[in-house]
Amino acid sequence: MKMATPANPLRDPNTLSNYNKFRTVHTSVNFEIRFDQKRLVGNVIHRLKSLTNAESKEVILDSSYLEVKSVKVNGEAAEWQLLPRFEPYGSPLKISLEQAIPLDELIEVDISVNTTEKCTALQWLNPEQTSNGKHPYMFSQCQAIHARAIFPCQDTPDVKATFDFNLSSPLPVIASGVPVKQDASPPQSSGSIYYRFEQKVPIPSYLFAIASGDIAQAQIGPRSHVAVSPDRLDECKWELEGDTERFLQTIGNIIFPYVWGEYNVLILPPSFPYGGMENPVYTFATPSIISKDRQNVDVIAHEISHSWSGNLVTNCSWEHFWLNEGWTTYLERRIQAAIHGEPYRHFSAIIGWKHLVDSVERHGDTHEFTKLVVDLKGKDPDDAFSSVPYEKGFTFIFHLENLIGKDKFDKFIPHYFTRFRGKSLDSYEFKSCILDFFASDEESHVLLNKLDWDSWFYKPGLPPKPSFDTSLVDVVYELANKWKYISQSSFSPKASDMDGLVANQIVVFLEQVLLFDNPLTPEQSRFMGQVYNFAQSQNIEVSYLYLQVGLKAGDDSIVEPTIKLLGEIGRMKFVRPLYRTLEKFNRDIAVDTFEKHKNFYHPICRGLLEKDLFGDKGA
């Protein structure tokens, strides 16, 4: 029997901490949220366990752009220093211990710390950047390596700890823990109120999350609430209450029941750079999923799936990110299949394949970042962010399902998530796990051992394309083909062409139009927008593609709505392709638009847009 590869104690290259000497087991975060200073001020207390038998007299934690005031170890002042900054990983905090610590003994490290204006994990919004314009707002985004910019920590997904949060703010607070019911505390002299949260399931640092602003909540299921600006509460409640509990029950039947207690969704202001962030208990989500037609809630199916894949069973480093995102994309599509039927799973996978092709073309098919297992030594994991870990990861897991058969693979799924529950793993442990599980099934064992694992893990570019059920895309391809040859045919577009199509089918239609060797003329593009009502669509998944069709067609009338949209949404899925297309249309307009809106964007998004537009030198 093949044995699992032993874990390398330093298998995460994107941390400077000595987490092979000490391991965080619990963290208490105590912060005052100061909107006037755009700072978090307070302290963090780590309980650390010694992994060696008195071999180390120092604790090294990740930190980045922090103001450290003091450090105590077991209640006594300790010597400490911030080491020189090492890009892109920050300035390690070295804490000296008076004596080495015996194996398994615990120490308590208390660090007084403030965030600074250079913090890459927090975005502070002025009232005018929120939907109702009444109050300021702040939120965190710690994935991949930004928790170290909020407090010193072992900022690696290879370490998991329980958390408690003690936070004070003049505005309501959300955090990635279960709210602790408490007597209403009177406002402090500063006008702030205390909020407490507990996370009893151990989580990695990148799942630490806080937000504060003008936030109201409404129930969307028996264990779920939506939290959002009060002016958007009713529309968000309607958008999410139809599917959230159904998603939770569906995936619970595939793996095992949900373990986190509550599942809630925080709808953030529009500058949030991602579709969703799977922070435990409270998914942080983009307002772009609120399309007023319940057609964009696949994001919620994805984030709910992370409650098992990523949050409970975690990649040990960002080099193995596909273990988080490939599995989650696979599970999201299993939810879709259970609810909408198997053809819809294939339809979603066809859309995903297109995104994978786009990412590989953009990077180049020999690029390191098109591999399933990537080398991130000395690199910023944010730079590797693309659809590759999602869609190449999905394709691999889908291939495994088809290789050994769905019924057999379905028995492996709960085994895998039970085996690594609460743990972090790498790709080689995953391989060993599935080989071990099917060791007594001769047919499956032979197939899995014949599989070219090295090609799947390390070969750049596109993997073999699966055989998909195309029934839901064939009608769309046919319509796109009519538009492709519209000048040479009698085809007369009508609004009824869209009858019976869901939003994702319209997305595929527009993606096909964008692939035309000969773009539409400006007149044809405008006519498409009018007859199909794309120009007025409230669904951003549709409108951002239609704007690209117009820009490729050279339609000047599209420029103004493109600039407008780029100032209203900060989700990278939309703004990065739009800027690329706008730059090809008119680079000066693209650069001017970025300069106008750059302070609206989240620091992660802003940094990647600078690289897209100006190269590695930035603006």
Swiss-Prot record:
Identify which residues the record assigns to the active site: 303, 390
GO terms for cellular component:
cytosol; nucleus
Q: What's its EC?
A: 3.4.11.-, 3.3.2.10
Binding of Zn(2+) occurs at: 302, 306, 325
Q: Which Pfam families match?
A: Leuk-A4-hydro_C, Peptidase_M1, Peptidase_M1_N
Named cofactor requirement(s): Zn(2+)
Question: Mainly resides where?
Answer: cytoplasm
What Gene3D superfamilies does the record point to? 3.30.2010.30, Neutral Protease Domain 2, Peptidase M1, leukotriene A4 hydrolase/aminopeptidase C-terminal domain, tricorn interacting facor f3 domain
* Database matches in InterPro entries: Aminopeptidase_N-like_N, Aminopeptidase_N-like_N_sf, ARM-type_fold, LTA4H, LTA4H_cat, M1_LTA-4_hydro/amino_C_sf, M1_LTA4H, Peptidase_M1
Q: Where in the cell is it found?
A: Cytoplasm; Nucleus
Binding of a peptide, residues: 141-143, 273-278
| Domain of life of the source | Eukaryota
Q: Which UniProt keywords apply?
A: Cytoplasm, Hydrolase, Metal-binding, Metalloprotease, Nucleus, Protease, Zinc
Among the GO biological process terms of this entry, one is: peptide catabolic process
Top-level EC class: hydrolase
- What does the note accompanying the cofactor annotation read? Binds 1 zinc ion per subunit.
Give the Gene Ontology MF terms in alphabetical order.
aminopeptidase activity; epoxide hydrolase activity; metallopeptidase activity; zinc ion binding
Catalysis performed (reactions): an epoxide + H2O = an ethanediol
Q: Which PROSITE patterns match?
A: ZINC_PROTEASE (PS00142)
Per the entry, what this protein does is: Aminopeptidase that preferentially cleaves di- and tripeptides. Also has low epoxide hydrolase activity (in vitro). Can hydrolyze the epoxide leukotriene LTA(4) but it forms preferentially 5,6-dihydroxy-7,9,11,14-eicosatetraenoic acid rather than the cytokine leukotriene B(4) as the product compared to the homologous mammalian enzyme (in vitro).
The family note in this entry says: Belongs to the peptidase M1 family.
Name of the protein this chain belongs to: Leucine aminopeptidase 2
Organism, per UniProt?
Coccidioides immitis (strain RS)
